[in-house]
Amino acid sequence: MAKRLRFAVVTPLNHRVVLTRDRWREIVRYKHPALTGHDGDVQDCLRDPDRIRASVKDPSTHLYYRTLAHCILCVVVGGEDPQQRFVVTAYFTQGLKTGQDLWKK
């Protein structure tokens, strides 16, 4: 049975990234409740980020950043296949993690 998608977007790196409904529910219920109602911002961050960095711990994990009015949104994306990447988590932050820049606006 296919997982139900909340959305799928193509990033500036030409990667297809998906977010399932179950994963989004887990993020906003248990990990980062402040993101409730911000799924549109998560999509925008993936489509039109300010910066994309590779994780220091795992270079195949990418961190997408977009500045909002009150903070910075970070969307963490995993997966090896550029056409089958997925949202691991997302959160609000005040700064960027260290890592190699892959793309900048």
For the regions a language model picked out, list residue spans one by one.
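Ribonuclease/tRNase effector modules and their secretory precursors
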Residues: 1-105
